[in-house]
């Protein structure tokens, strides 16, 4: 597998999807899972400061994320929320939800099961993917960029003002500091002056050199998770102890 880590706005998602398409691999956006849960708590009017309630209800919603890098989507209880989870409101709250230990324990277990089930391999991206979720990944890349470049990318994604986005991003970096540690065996890639195609090419070349992503780590437990139709090339679900 290939693990792509890095701060918000560094281009993790776009690069990971591109690499997965180039190599014919599955794709896992771990951040979308945290965002989906955050969005659901917002619709339930749960105070992000109420960590006990968040911990108690973390397994309630059914959340699915697409495994197809060419058709990424996120669903909560069967409803597509791919756009809703990318708002500034969700971005402002997701760090608080992600810091709740019960939430992290629940989602990390799901993410590891998804990675173990992925065939022929997976490009997984998100905070602490290479240090906590998948420390045995064959290739780990820590993607970064200067604050201005990251803010511009995030602003384009959220259709927001770059100046406001940079301030919000700095705040989130402080909140996410514990999950932003670079793995000791990761390769640092500064994308500040690189195009998306150049980033994809560099990671793809490294993966081919190492043979990363073309097999599942030895000893990994296979967990059967149902797909959602040929057009989606499979999907991954987590909902309490059930797949849906």
Where are the regions a protein language model picked out?
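N-terminal phosphate/diphosphate-binding loop that engages ATP/GTP or pyrophosphate donors
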Residues: 21-86
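Hydrophobic anchor at the beta1->P-loop junction of P-loop NTPases
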Residues: 4
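ATP-dependent NMP and nucleoside kinases share a basic, alpha-helical "lid"
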Residues: 82-157
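Small-molecule kinase domains that catalyze NTP-dependent phosphoryl transfer to phosphate-bearing small molecules
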Residues: 66, 111-119, 129-136, 160-202
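Conserved lysine of the Walker
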Residues: 12
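NTP-dependent small-molecule kinase module
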Residues: 76-82, 149-152, 159-160, 179-244
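P-loop (Walker A) phosphate-binding loop of NTP-binding proteins
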Residues: 7
